[in-house]
């Protein structure tokens, strides 16, 4: 979907909006109104996690908003998972102040497109997707090529993906119980 047409396409494709807590439980709220910048400043147990569920050609995609840190400021985006919660349907990224021609390239198709078809799980373990300096190779299901000269921004994308995907593991486990939930979350209930 073209960025410029997102507001028109949104109601056509997005069928459900959820707000989750750290346990993967639905809570009150409007996903579109969740401000990740503010949420990330909160304790993990207090964060609201927005989730959008779209449908394309009769198949669901789970869209997770992302926010992290680049070299000069915030980076953000969305990653969309297919209904198996493993294969990436697509990813988009953006920034406010990354270096033109270097880290600023995260919002270009040559960087975003290779995420499609990658996997975030190896078996039941979350691997996420790593942005790899020097190239990932076509057979690497958990990596994409980094941006030459944009190492810190690339590392920021890697960290952002892992951190945000980890937050959604409890929800993933509720709808697909074979997914291993990181021990960080199971130990939180005892705190």
Give short role names for the model-derived ranges.
Residues 1-191:
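Flexible, solvent-exposed loop/hinge segments and secondary-structure transition points
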């Amino acid at each position: 979907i073209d960025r410029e047409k997102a507001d028109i396409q949104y109601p056509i494709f997005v069928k459900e909006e959820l707000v989750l807590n750290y346990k993967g439980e639905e809570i009150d709220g409007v996903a579109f109104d969740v401000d990740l910048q503010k949420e990330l400043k909160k304790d993990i147990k207090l964060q609201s996690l927005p989730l959008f569920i779209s449908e394309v050609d009769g198949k669901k995609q789970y869209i997770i908003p992302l926010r992290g840190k680049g070299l000069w400021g915030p980076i953000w985006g969305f990653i969309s998972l297919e209904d198996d919660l493993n294969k990436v349907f697509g990813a988009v990224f953006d920034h406010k102040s990354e270096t033109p021609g270097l880290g600023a390239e995260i919002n270009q198709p040559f960087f975003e497109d290779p995420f499609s078809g990658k996997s975030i799980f190896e078996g039941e373990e979350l691997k996420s997707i790593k942005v790899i300096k020097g190239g990932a190779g076509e057979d690497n299901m958990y990596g994409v090529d980094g941006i030459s000269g944009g190492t810190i921004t690339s590392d920021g994308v890697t960290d952002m993906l892992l951190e945000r995907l980890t937050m959604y593991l409890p929800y993933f486990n509720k709808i697909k119980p074979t997914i291993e939930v990181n021990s960080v979350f199971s130990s939180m209930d005892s705190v």
